[in-house]
């Protein structure tokens, strides 16, 4: 035969509470307390809080905006000796200058290129 399944059990699962028909005042209904969070420093707050990091530190470690080259077989990490790019605090060394189109491989130290003239002492 055909078994008929009541849809009301699927839409509304049976609960232990029975609907009451008595009228009560709105103030009599007690609301559930929100979950309390610790206010004093404790181990739970240390687990939930993420540590604060500066964007330059994120770039140095390779997390976040990749403004730094990551250490590969050809590039050493930034900040070490003979690194391809300096640590994040030295940004003036690698800025482009007005004379960069003449000497694209030369990195300016933050000064304009000055032409040295020989002084005739004769």
Curated annotation (Swiss-Prot):
Keywords: Early protein
Region (Disordered): 17-36
Origin: domain of life: Viruses
Protein name: Probable protein E4
Phylogenetic lineage: Viruses, Monodnaviria, Shotokuvirae, Cossaviricota, Papovaviricetes
